[in-house]
Amino acid sequence: MDKFGDIRPYTDAEARDAFKRMADDPHIEPITNYIKPGLPVEAMRGLLSSLTSVWDFQHKVMYDVVTSIIRQTTAGVTYSGLENLKDGRTHLLISNHRDIILDPAIIQVLLYENKVHTTEIAVGDNLI
């Protein structure tokens, strides 16, 4: 097994299994009520069960969740430098590390809204 295998991002095949586990998890009801008030839990289960890729999850679930958090908890988000990202090249993006989960999620939204490929994120267990 790869040295970092336990913290690497899911492949699409692994993600499909994870989406089904999420749909069946007993915590899905309170999570749904929090992130999508008014959405019937069965609709969330159906959505999660229909996802086929990490991209689907980012586009159909997380985008709405993160933009809702931004609207409800900030006066706005500012950024600069996206014009420096070159297609086909890898880049390292660094935030000020206020929130180990939310910072990269907001970066994903900014990339998505600017039609830049989103990133893969791994979080070490020493940071959780």
Regions found by a protein language model. Name each.
Residues 1-91, 97-108, 112, 118:
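Membrane-anchoring hydrophobic helices of lipid-metabolizing enzymes
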Residues 97-99, 124-128:
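Short glycine-enriched loops at secondary-structure junctions
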